[in-house]
Structure formats: structure tokens, C-alpha cells
Amino acid sequence: VRPANRVTPGLNWVANRIPILDLDRTELRQGFALSHTIFTPEDIEAEIPDQTDRPYAAWLYASGTVVGTTRLGPGQTVQDVMQVTLGIVGPTAGGEFVQENWHDLLQAIEPRGWESQLKDELGLEITAQRLRQFEGPALPFRLETDNALHGGVTLGNVRTYASAGGMARLGWDLSSDFGPPRIRPALAGAGVFKPGQPFGGYIFAGIEGRAIARDMFLDGNLFRDGARIEDRRDFGADLQLGVALHQGDVQIAFTYVHRTEEFVAQSGPQRFGAVSISIAR
């Protein structure tokens, strides 16, 4: 995510049609990304996958993000984020090729159920989010504190949901970012990193709740028949804990995520980690 004097026309056209966003901010940034995500059931050795588990799916997509930030007054900052994501779900996304070759390289279990994956379908998501950050009291050893509240909505044929949550942080040079970037759906953190000191870092904890209207990776294709589950949960939540450190213009962050069950037959909550490396520009 880089500083920008103006927003790319296509992204600006979308942003102007989202009434909850205000991108006329003091600081404007935009960025672009190419990503690939794979979903599989728990038992990948079965040639006929468990119908009560999530279907095989791959999602290859490009996204454009616009971030507008302004300081409202002493100790309070507002950030608006708009993201447009366009991609392909299905065999064309290459999930089978990537997983099978990766498992061959690692000499791991061969996945056998990709024949039942979701069918090809173009995917579109538009995300709008507002975050309000409040500076907390200063502590001994020059420690800083802050907390943030955020809310947003994502609309599209891939996923449609509303989210709200909060985060608290403790450390040094907290103004360098709004939290480390993570794979959506996730807590706010737009990937903006701008260090104010040569060295800094923080620990953080956050929670987010989501009301989910659609998730293609559980509900199946929207425009084509195929694999799906019937017992997706309409509400979900994440608990996230982590640490971020930066030296100069490079930041490394680790996030531990505890995610509630996404469907009734799921064997338990998901627990996973995310590592990100950011370079200030």
C-alpha cells in the first residue's frame, strides 16, 4: 500500500458509490495485490469427500485497496478502507495443481478429492470498512497504548457478511500502523506501515464478530450446481493475539487466530498462524 495523490479511476468510481466511506482524507494510499487461497476438507485421502465437510475449492484473485486516514483531534484517528477483489473460483484457479505438486515436494499425503471441487465461477467482492483509533495512557518505559473499534461490510458472490470488532495494543511507535495485514476475513489492518522511529513493536489482542449471509467456500457455487454443505453457521468470531516488530523500514508480524466453527459438522474451532513482512515505501 503506497502513498497516492489520487485514486485509480476504477476504484474511485466504486468508492464514490459507497455512502459510508469518506476517502477525502489527510493521507491517501492505495495498493494492489495478487493472491491464491486453497480450501480442502479435513480428510484429503478420501476420493469421495465427506459431504458434511467443506468442499475442495481454489480462489485466485487480484485486489485493489484504497485507504484514507485523518487525525480528528488529540488522540483520535479515523481510517476508511475500500477494497475491490476480482478473481476466479474453480479448476482454473489451479488449486489442484498447487497442492498436489507441493505435497509431492514434501512427500506428504496425496490429496484425492479434487475432482469434486467447486466449478469455475468469476468472483467479485467489494469491502468497505471504517476504523476509529483512540490513543491510551502512556506507561513507564515510554510504552504506548491504544485501542480501536471497527465495522464494515463485504458484498459479493464469493462472500457477503457484516463485521464489527476491536483491538488493543501495547508497545512502542504505535502510530506506525493500524495493525499488521492479514488474510480476510480478519480484523482491521489495511497494510499501511509508516515507521516513526528506527525501532518499534507491540503486542496486540483483538476480537471480531461476523454475520454471514454467503460464503461460496461452504455454500457452493452461486450460478452452478456443485458441492456444498447444508449446515453453515450464520455467525462467526475470531480471537487474535500477536506481536509485531520493526527495524528501520521492515516490519515482521506474527498473528495467532482462534476462529469459531463455521459449520455444524466441523470438528472444532480453527487455530492457525499468519506471518507478514511489510516494507515501508
Regions found by a protein language model. Give the residues of each.
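Extracellular loop and loop/strand-boundary signature of outer-membrane beta-barrel proteins
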Residues: 48-51, 109-116, 152, 225-229, ...
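Short loop/turn motifs that connect adjacent beta-strands in outer-membrane beta-barrel proteins
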Residues: 3-28, 69-81, 133-147, 173-201
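Sequence/structural signature of outer-membrane beta-barrel proteins
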Residues: 39-43, 71, 89-93, 133-137, ...
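Residues on the lipid-exposed face of transmembrane beta-strands in outer-membrane beta-barrel proteins
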Residues: 1-3, 34, 62-68, 86, ...
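Residues that define the transmembrane beta-barrel architecture of outer-membrane proteins
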Residues: 1, 28, 56-60, 80, ...
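Outer membrane beta-barrel transmembrane domains
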Residues: 42-44, 167, 172-281
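Transmembrane beta-strand segments that form the barrel wall of outer-membrane beta-barrel proteins
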Residues: 12, 143-155, 228-229, 254-260
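Long, hydrophobic/aromatic-enriched structural stretches that serve as scaffold segments
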Residues: 16-98
